């Protein structure tokens, strides 16, 4: 028991920081009820006021994604000038300032209907920049831990994000407004505290050794992002990649399994799970009339969340083993949000082609299932992509703790 508890030492501040940031992103621009201040308890009028002032065809999630992708691409190109990010005051200030400004814009929008469109668009752009930088700052902190702790802290933070989101969505307008302002403040303070407690020898270095990018891994993740994007706007309630019920279910299973069975934890099995879940999810799409949309939606959302989690774990491991700044790897992964955005346009294009709904579902199912299955089999046959040992066995505790 003491050994298990020791695994969690040193991660409380990171978990709080990332959990608050994920909840904030979901409550502002990335969640299903984003921008509706106060939620069901008291914010319906506020959310309606914002919606009435914004053209029905405009989605601030798009402008959030746009800013998020652009700032990620910029960091991919210029990361050598700024790393380590946590030593760069300008980066930390821009991240915190943009997140706080976005919160203020969301809070003010219902009270200033004539300016709500500008506030929400500007706020979404600021949120994308701030959150994109925050994730890279947080990645530098997390990369200082052992692989097993990275697994536990990352899943624990995502769990916390869902819990915070759940409670905030039930608040009244004033409480929710205060929460939206407080969350980025807390996230930034906790992250600063987490970085300050990292020993100097384990902090990210300024130099960048020669390295090659794991392009095949990024291609695989891009395919999953594209596949998820095609169904992202049609998922049932509670399914989604951000702080949702499907995320809670997945992260609870991962955290508890790693915590209570760390010595027998088989990551190789996890590597093979996303393709099974994704294909099953898309095969259930045509059968929604019989099984309901929930089964398909949850399988698709859990699959994409699991793949995203595993890709991050692989990138952290590659960064630690090769001494490469995690910022560049995570920035590329974040920029691949572009594939989800593009995938989201496919259903509309198929509808414009005049195909019946059943035919559209069938076409999407066949194409995505074949692509995902072929790509996964091909790419994960490459031994350099991960930590799966050549004998095929699970990673041992020694593998996890190797510094």
Segments from the language model and where they lie:
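C-terminal ends and interior cores of transmembrane alpha-helices
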Residues: 96-113, 276-290
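A late C-terminal transmembrane helix in Major Facilitator Superfamily
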Residues: 324-352
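Flexible interhelical linker loops that connect adjacent transmembrane helices
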Residues: 191-220
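Hydrophobic core of transmembrane alpha-helices in multi-pass small-molecule transporters
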Residues: 116-136, 292-309
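Intracellular juxtamembrane helix-capping segments at the cytosolic ends
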Residues: 131-145, 307-322
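Membrane-proximal linker segments that couple transmembrane helices to downstream signaling/catalytic modules
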Residues: 375-403
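Central cavity-lining transmembrane alpha-helices of secondary-active solute carriers
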Residues: 59-82, 249-258
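Helix-loop boundary and gating motifs at the non-cytosolic
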Residues: 1-72, 216, 220-240
């Amino acid at each position: 028991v003491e050994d298990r508890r020791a695994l969690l030492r040193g991660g409380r501040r990171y978990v709080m920081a990332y959990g608050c940031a994920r909840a904030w992103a979901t409550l502002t621009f990335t969640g299903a009820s984003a921008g509706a201040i106060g939620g069901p308890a008291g914010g319906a009028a506020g959310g309606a006021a914002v919606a009435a002032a914004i053209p029905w065809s405009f989605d601030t999630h798009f402008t959030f994604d746009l800013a998020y992708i652009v700032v990620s691409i910029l960091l991919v190109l210029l990361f050598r000038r700024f790393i380590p990010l946590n030593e760069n005051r300008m980066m930390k200030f821009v991240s915190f300032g943009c997140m706080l400004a976005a919160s203020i814009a969301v809070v003010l929008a219902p009270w200033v209907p004539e300016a709500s469109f500008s506030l929400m668009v500007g706020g979404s752009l600021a949120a994308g920049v701030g959150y994109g930088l925050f994730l890279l700052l947080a990645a530098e902190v997390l990369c200082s831990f052992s692989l097993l702790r990275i697994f536990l802290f990352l899943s624990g933070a995502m769990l916390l994000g869902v819990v915070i989101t759940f409670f905030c969505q039930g608040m009244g307008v004033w409480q929710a407004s205060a929460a939206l302002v407080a969350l980025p403040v807390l996230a930034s303070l906790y992250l600063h505290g987490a970085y300050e407690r990292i020993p100097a020898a384990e902090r990210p270095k300024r130099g960048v050794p020669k390295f090659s990018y794991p392009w095949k891994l990024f291609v695989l993740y891009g395919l999953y992002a594209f596949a998820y994007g095609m169904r992202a706007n049609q998922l049932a309630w509670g399914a989604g990649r951000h702080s949702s019920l499907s995320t809670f279910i997945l992260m609870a299973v991962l955290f508890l399994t790693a915590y209570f069975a760390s010595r027998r934890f088989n990551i190789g099995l996890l590597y093979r799970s996303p393709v099974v879940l994704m294909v099953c999810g898309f095969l259930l799409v045509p059968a929604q009339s019989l099984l309901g949309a929930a089964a398909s939606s949850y399988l698709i959302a859990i699959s994409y969340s699991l793949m995203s989690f595993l890709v991050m774990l692989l990138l952290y491991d590659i960064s630690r083993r090769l001494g490469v700044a995690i910022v560049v790897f995570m920035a590329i992964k974040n920029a691949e949000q572009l594939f989800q955005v593009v995938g989201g346009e496919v259903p509309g294009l198929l509808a414009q082609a005049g195909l019946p709904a059943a035919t559209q579902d069938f076409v999407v199912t066949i194409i995505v299932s074949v692509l995902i299955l072929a790509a996964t089999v091909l790419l994960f046959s490459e031994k350099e992509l991960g930590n799966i040992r050549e004998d095929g066995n699970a990673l041992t505790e020694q593998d996890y703790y190797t510094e």
